[in-house]
Amino acid sequence: MPTINYLFASQDFPDAPGPEGIRVAIGDGNVMFGAIRIEHAPDGSDNINPVVVFGVKQGLGVGKALVVDALKKHPDLRLVARGHSVGFYEALGFVRCGWEDIDPKYRTDCDMCPMLGTCGPVPFKSVPARHVLTFLGTSSGCGVPAFFCHCPACEEARRDPSKRRGCTGVVIQGNGTTLIDTPPDVRQALIREGFDTIDELFLTHAHYDHLGGLGELEYFIRLCREDTLPFRGSSHALAEALQEFSYMDDCFELDAIDDYATRSFDGMTIQALPLNHCPGAFGYLITTPNGHRTFYAPDTAELKPEVVEILKGVDTLIMDATFWKNVGVHKTHHTVRQTVDEGINLLGAGKVILQHLAPHMCDEGVNEIHEIYQYAAQFGGRVAVAEDGMKVEL
């Protein structure tokens, strides 16, 4: 029997063991508050049958917590509601559907029920989650402003906090919350954007500007989550992360991903694509239930031919655009123009979003950030410059 992990942090309900398909809410003294059973029907659908909340705990949000947690791993749920539970599921965003959307097993159960004429059964199905990507940071490792730099972009950011950029990282939120990378300033960024929980953690690579904030998650995991956090990346990146944060080796459920392998969570499919940057570096191709494909690659040199083939026609390309001009370019990054050229002409991307910016090696008196915005403007909205806090619907 597996352990049901991280169910009710926001309601302060700790974890509890239970059989596959059943999630339970347990309070202090091992008192059970409620349970939900998810059944996989012959037609391939996942069905709630049933949600049970014990009377003494009704009104505390136990049922809502059970259903919301179930949606993270079973985004397409079906059920038959009766009586007061009809309003409960409508409040959670479920929509009424036809009986043809319900597996015959459950339709037959209703047909045979002696209470059919009085209980008024109503078929429901969940609505696919709307996934939104939020940029926690959009700079290279130095940040903007860099403490040592007095270029026009950094000086402007000193005067105007809205121009500041933290190290690169993103959150994707649907029913669940997925964090990609833990930059050194991840705590401040999560607070700024209003995120208070994490369900999954992916690592692109183990350089400090993408890993340095991992320690900020320790007490969230130990005190709030009270169970291990799924931590996914290449075997090389995970090994380096645990070498640096060895005191957190009991905090994670490690998942070493092979090149081109996929993982599924919250209705998304996330594919790890190898990059030319450092050993074990990945970009992640994220496909949401609506078929939208987004490639997130904060650090990369020229894309591998195999990766190019996979990415052709990608809807949104969010990629390394570290340098504005060729000054300072080396073999592990892109310039802005390279990213735009690859995105539009090589991949045929619907939209290109520039990130991981480093405006510090500029000509005297030149604000490279301004010049990047001016350059992007000529593409009629097809090219955008990422900003801290910017949100993109996937």
Give the location of each predicted region.
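Conserved active-site alpha-helix within GNAT-family acetyltransferase domains
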Residues: 83-108
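A short, internal acetyl-CoA/4′-phosphopantetheine-binding micro-motif in the GNAT/acyltransferase core
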Residues: 50-58
